[in-house]
Amino acid sequence: MDEQTRIELEAAAFRRLLQHLRDHTDVQNIDLMLLADFCRNCLAKWYGAAAKERGIEMEYPAAQEIIYGMPYAEWKAKYQKEATPEQLKAMEEIQRRKEAADH
C-alpha cells in the first residue's frame, strides 16, 4: 500500500470514529477514560498538537469543536452527566497509578 492511500484510510477511519462518538453521546468521557484511557478531550488535544506540529495555530476550543461536532459548552450542556462517586473514585485511582509510574 502506498503512503497516500494509507493516510487516506487512516483519515477515513478517524472520521468514522468521530461520527461514532457523536452518535453515541450516551457514552460519557469519564466512561471512555476509565475503559480506554482517552476521551473526546484527549482527541481534541491530539488534534491541536498535530496542527501545531504542522505550523497551524489552533486554540483548544476550536479543536474541541472539530471533535465534538459542536462547541464543547453546548455538548456538555446537552449530553454530559454528573460523574458518579464510583466513577470519580476510579479516576482518582487511575491518576494515582499514572503518577506512581511517572516517578
What feature does the model see in each segment?
Residues 1-103:
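Domain-level signature for proteins that mediate thiol-based redox and metal-cofactor handling
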